[in-house]
Regions:
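Aliphatic-rich helix starts adjacent to a transmembrane/signal segment
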Residues: 35-56, 60
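N-terminal single-pass transmembrane signal-anchor helix
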Residues: 8-41
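Amphipathic alpha-helical interaction segments
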Residues: 60, 81, 108-112
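Intrinsically disordered, low-complexity regions enriched in Pro/Ser/Thr/Gly and acidic residues
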Residues: 87-245
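Juxtamembrane "stalk/linker" segments
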Residues: 72-77, 82, 86
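Alpha-helix exit/C-cap motif
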Residues: 57-76
Length: 245
């Protein structure tokens, strides 16, 4: 008779061990998932910012073929609703749809273009990659994710305004002002659409430290210089970026 030894071992877990294991997995997930999500948001912002910059400036070049040097394009004029006497009501600004359509949107692939609400100068262009551009009469705001687009209503005036807390994270400010010859505009003069650099002194510190529009947590206006800071770093969000995604 030959004996057969069974060397296999039955491994059993107690309920307490299972719960402890699940608890550890839960803690690890709670620590890592927010980081993974933040990293994903950063990557989306980087990719779409660079793509938008390339796409909109290709549009500028194509428009120059049709309309000549961009510094000679007809000026962008503010548009207003008319009052009962047929005069401009300066409290009710409208988007200059014709300007943006003529020089930019005609040369860009969009899913939808529409004014935002009533009594606002905002014209929204939804792009195929899931982003949205707000062509305002003063500047251009780019939202890497269209779902993040949101405006606030000023309680005092009833006017729509930017949600400043989202600037530099959920939206980024650009400017098109190629004909401005003043010294403060030197980084936009004879340039296409650039990250907002009006009044910039040319240094990284200048982008970070401006109390009104610097890329830092506390500012009096919006963090308009953040896109320029990312551009300076090769369209990658710097490791020491002052805002959390």
């Amino acid at each position: 008779h030959v004996a057969h030894w069974n060397n296999s071992r039955k491994i059993a877990f107690t309920l307490a061990e299972v719960l402890i294991t699940l608890g550890i997995i839960g803690v690890v997930a709670a620590l890592t998932i927010p980081t993974l999500m933040a990293n994903h948001r950063r990557q989306v912002a980087e990719t779409r910012l660079e793509k938008f910059y390339s796409t909109i400036n290709q549009a500028v070049k194509m428009a120059e073929v049709d309309y000549g040097d961009m510094t000679q394009w007809e000026p962008r004029e503010n548009k207003y609703e008319k009052d009962e006497n047929g005069n401009d009501d300066k409290t009710k600004e409208l988007p200059n749809t014709e300007y943006w359509q003529k020089y930019f949107l005609s040369y860009m692939k969009t899913l939808k273009v529409e004014p935002y609400g009533h009594n606002t100068s905002c014209l929204l262009a939804y792009l195929p990659d899931g982003s949205v551009v707000n062509f305002a009469n003063g500047s251009i705001q780019f939202y890497p994710s269209a779902k993040d687009f949101k405006f606030l209503v000023d309680e005092d005036t009833g006017k729509i305004k930017n949600n400043m807390e989202n600037s530099g994270v959920k939206y980024f400010t650009f400017l098109f002002y190629p004909s401005g010859t003043q010294d403060a505009n030197k980084y936009h003069y004879k340039k296409g659409v650039e990250p907002y650099k009006y009044g910039w002194d040319g240094t990284k510190e200048g982008l970070l430290n401006s109390n009104s529009i610097g890329c830092k947590k506390q500012v009096s206006n919006e963090r308009a210089y953040c896109a320029a800071l990312i551009q300076m770093n090769g369209w990658k969000i710097p490791k020491d970026y002052p805002l959390r995604f």
